Amino acid sequence: MTKKLSLELRQTRKPIQTACGFCHEKHLQCDVGRPCQNCRKRNIASFCRDKVKRRRKRKRSDASNFDKDEAATQTLNFNTVNPGEGSSSAMTQDEKNTGTTTATTTRTTTNFRSESKASSSTENISRAMKDPADTIIANSLLDKPTIGDTDDTGWGFGSIWTNDEYMTLNDLTSFASESMPNQLGPIEEQRSPRRTLGEPLARRYDSSQPFQYLNFGSKLHKTDSRPYISLEQPGNVPSIPAFTMNKGSNDEDASPQQKESQQMQLWQQQASQLQQQASQLQQQASQLQQQRTQQNEPVSEWTPFQLRLLIKTPKDLFDKKNLVKPHNYRKAYKDLLECLHKMFLGSYYRRQNGRWRPVSDDEDQMRRRLMRKEQLQHIAKSIGELYMPKFVALTSNMIEEDLLLQELVLQRSLLELENMSKLVNCTPICIWRRSGEICFVSNEFCSLTGFYKREILDQRRFIVEFMDHQSVVSYYDLFHEHLAFGPKDSTRTILNKDQAVYTECNLLLNNGSYLKCACCLTARRDAFNISLLLMGQFLPIFDVQ
């Protein structure tokens, strides 16, 4: 710490013109000697140098100074030429020529500076418009207006530099909006007038334009925090106009104006088709809502496809929560048993005179029929012994409001999982209830299996319908042991703690064959530790031969 000086020493010391670099940085009193005493005491005498001062930047008030010089010159000339004041001698011819030359030079210099400034600004703006992406370089090239360079136009902002930057961005984005029309909304040509130097700023720039550079093309629709985006199914992709399919030498010979007009027509047709499809879906949703409301049918009886037409966001769910009723799991399990019976024994039995009879008495058929019957009994036994007792114990004290809350939580979780599936859109995903009813399939799952999304979601379908017999047996063993109510042994594996199980299964394809896949099963539970939703992520396994 620097030692404080006495009052006498401070009074005798006088400031010097230039201090050394060390004393200047440490705010010490330096002396005129080099090296100074402070540097000698610290053994840094070899580094003692005068502090190099920065040159002061001149204020750019040349225009006002030129105006003052011009006014002073004109006043001097007027006072010299006027013969009615005093007895001073007349100006000589050389002095007149000199005064005239000075005034002319001043005016010429002022005009030249203003013209060069306007031309450089125009060149920079045009250069930036040619390359809309390089906006930062374009903004840095613009000349900053001087302090005294003002006109009689009204500025939209308090800062002239900010104003100039916003106007440049507006010009760039207006140019970009003409070259990149928006395909999400109606195609409209937005031709914004170019900024001219002679046009008053108040007229060409209003209070709503500073943020106009954020809009490219037509205005985008405001999306929710979880927008429901449904990709087109196979076979429902809008058709491409015929003239785009017949591209030949005519396109090469066409002028840029013709190509632009053809592209605009293509965009307009695609936009109109998308609008028609959106309006049709909206009409279907409104008609469906009216019919269901008149019939007082709860949301739980709707198919997942119909439900998603009505409820697309969490806000829609809570706005229409009066339509949500507890799910009828009794009917769901009844349909599941019928589905399993048809899947395992449907091809081996037929109904005759109200009774089920074997289709064939062949030994091979009998052996297969017996194996399928044992597999079905194993599934029923695991449901009765591992699942039903715990489920009854956990739900015995639940009231109707608890079931309603459970369904609301399920629908809200389903929206969240659907949103998550759009972030990992490279993995085929299927989501179903604990009863096996499918609630959601991703587009990748449809591409993997070959089924249409509406074919799966527009009716009650179970996940077991898309597996082979052995995969169904393995699924129920894993579900009852690890996923239904959590693992029996909490210290088993980390995967079980994360409520996820990895296994293999065979997925049914649209052509009737099966594809071997690696499967990750994840359970989403409620406050009663009951699984609400199960999500399966499937990746195909290709055997290397």
Swiss-Prot record:
<keyword id="KW-0238">DNA-binding</keyword>
<keyword id="KW-0805">Transcription regulation</keyword>
<feature type="compositionally biased region" description="Polar residues">
    <location>
        <begin position="72"/>
        <end position="92"/>
    </location>
</feature>
<feature type="compositionally biased region" description="Low complexity">
    <location>
        <begin position="98"/>
        <end position="110"/>
    </location>
</feature>
<dbReference type="InterPro" id="IPR036864">
    <property type="entry name" value="Zn2-C6_fun-type_DNA-bd_sf"/>
</dbReference>
<dbReference type="Pfam" id="PF24990">
    <property type="entry name" value="PAS_13"/>
</dbReference>
<protein>
    <recommendedName>
        <fullName>Glucose starvation modulator protein 1</fullName>
    </recommendedName>
</protein>
<feature type="compositionally biased region" description="Low complexity">
    <location>
        <begin position="257"/>
        <end position="270"/>
    </location>
</feature>
<dbReference type="InterPro" id="IPR050335">
    <property type="entry name" value="ERT1_acuK_gluconeogen_tf"/>
</dbReference>
<feature type="compositionally biased region" description="Polar residues">
    <location>
        <begin position="111"/>
        <end position="125"/>
    </location>
</feature>
<dbReference type="GO" id="GO:0000977">
    <property type="term" value="F:RNA polymerase II transcription regulatory region sequence-specific DNA binding"/>
</dbReference>
<feature type="compositionally biased region" description="Basic residues">
    <location>
        <begin position="51"/>
        <end position="60"/>
    </location>
</feature>
<feature type="region of interest" description="Disordered">
    <location>
        <begin position="228"/>
        <end position="270"/>
    </location>
</feature>
<dbReference type="InterPro" id="IPR001138">
    <property type="entry name" value="Zn2Cys6_DnaBD"/>
</dbReference>
<keyword id="KW-0804">Transcription</keyword>
<feature type="domain" description="PAS">
    <location>
        <begin position="416"/>
        <end position="486"/>
    </location>
</feature>
<keyword id="KW-0479">Metal-binding</keyword>
<comment type="similarity">
    <text>Belongs to the ERT1/acuK family.</text>
</comment>
<dbReference type="InterPro" id="IPR000014">
    <property type="entry name" value="PAS"/>
</dbReference>
<comment type="function">
    <text>Transcription factor which regulates nonfermentable carbon utilization.</text>
</comment>
<dbReference type="Pfam" id="PF00172">
    <property type="entry name" value="Zn_clus"/>
</dbReference>
<dbReference type="InterPro" id="IPR035965">
    <property type="entry name" value="PAS-like_dom_sf"/>
</dbReference>
<feature type="region of interest" description="Disordered">
    <location>
        <begin position="51"/>
        <end position="131"/>
    </location>
</feature>
<dbReference type="GO" id="GO:0005634">
    <property type="term" value="C:nucleus"/>
</dbReference>
<dbReference type="GO" id="GO:0009267">
    <property type="term" value="P:cellular response to starvation"/>
</dbReference>
<keyword id="KW-0539">Nucleus</keyword>
<dbReference type="GO" id="GO:0000981">
    <property type="term" value="F:DNA-binding transcription factor activity, RNA polymerase II-specific"/>
</dbReference>
<dbReference type="InterPro" id="IPR056751">
    <property type="entry name" value="PAS_13"/>
</dbReference>
<feature type="compositionally biased region" description="Basic and acidic residues">
    <location>
        <begin position="61"/>
        <end position="71"/>
    </location>
</feature>
<keyword id="KW-0862">Zinc</keyword>
<dbReference type="GO" id="GO:0008270">
    <property type="term" value="F:zinc ion binding"/>
</dbReference>
<feature type="DNA-binding region" description="Zn(2)-C6 fungal-type">
    <location>
        <begin position="20"/>
        <end position="48"/>
    </location>
</feature>
